[in-house]
Design a protein with these regions (language model features):
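Short acidic/polar inter-strand loop motif in beta-rich domains
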Residues: 55, 62-85, 204-214
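Short, surface-exposed loop/turn segments at beta-strand-coil junctions that are enriched for proline
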Residues: 187-194
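Surface-exposed loop/edge segments in extracytoplasmic proteins
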Residues: 18-26, 163-172, 211-212
Length: 231
């Protein structure tokens, strides 16, 4: 899928390799593309994958005087700085030879992982049974779930509880169809064991595809709930 407006798009920069001059830069914005067309439609090798239907694209006209080696770089998704990835490709461009069909395609690897529950900086209560819940999506914003185009059964999604730099528990997370998130219960440790609170971390790992994502947040631990403030 394509990094479109739903995830903030991507920044694209075209640089002359010889002298380092920036020839063009801008944002790729638009739709993320037709998932059925991209993921499931059979096609010949020379047929376009992404541009056969409206999808996000960055277009530039370069005033080249001669064949020029350029570096085309892209970084995104811009709406998720914690998951920002960058890639580049070097190629020769020739004046008068416009790129057609899909043009130059750059691939970014990773997942958007977001802890949905508990929400920082929410305090956790010692000995409470708490549910850790997180969403996992591709960088383009497509849902990762069992039996989907991005099948969660083929990757590892797990949670970790950390006290300081030490992992004290690893949690196996399961998909919940109603909330469309992955979840796992855990018990909150005592404040004496975690005086500076705990860190919750969720990891999505696909070593075969080279895609990884992580989200983490720190939570204070209290002995008991604070009384509600009266107004």
């Amino acid at each position: 899928m394509v990094l479109g407006r739903d995830v903030g798009g991507a920044r694209v920069t075209i640089t002359d390799v010889t002298n380092g001059h920036i020839l063009a830069t801008g944002l790729q914005l638009g739709d993320s593309g037709d998932q059925n067309q991209i993921m499931r439609t059979p096609r010949m090798m020379e047929e376009p994958i992404y541009s056969s239907r409206p999808s996000a694209v960055f277009t530039a006209t370069l005033a080249l005087q001669k064949p020029t080696f350029v570096e085309i770089s892209a970084e995104g998704p811009l709406a998720y700085p914690a998951a920002l990835q960058k890639t580049s490709k070097t190629l020769l461009l020739v004046p008068g030879q416009d790129l057609t069909h899909d043009g130059i395609v750059l691939h970014l690897y990773g997942y958007l992982v977001e802890i949905e529950q508990p929400r920082p900086p929410e305090a956790l209560i010692a000995k409470d049974d708490v549910k850790l819940r997180a969403s996992v999506r591709t960088l383009s914003g497509s849902l990762v779930r069992p039996h989907g185009d991005w099948d969660s059964r083929k990757i590892r999604i797990y949670g970790e509880i950390l006290i300081g730099d030490r992992i004290v528990e690893r949690l196996q997370m399961f998909y919940d169809e109603v909330s469309r998130t992955f979840e796992a219960p855990f018990f909150v440790p005592l404040p004496t064991d975690a005086p500076d609170g705990i860190m919750l971390r969720v990891v999505a790992a696909d070593p075969a595809g080279g895609n990884f994502g992580v989200s983490q947040a720190t939570f204070p631990v209290l002995n008991e709930r604070r009384p509600a403030t009266r107004r």
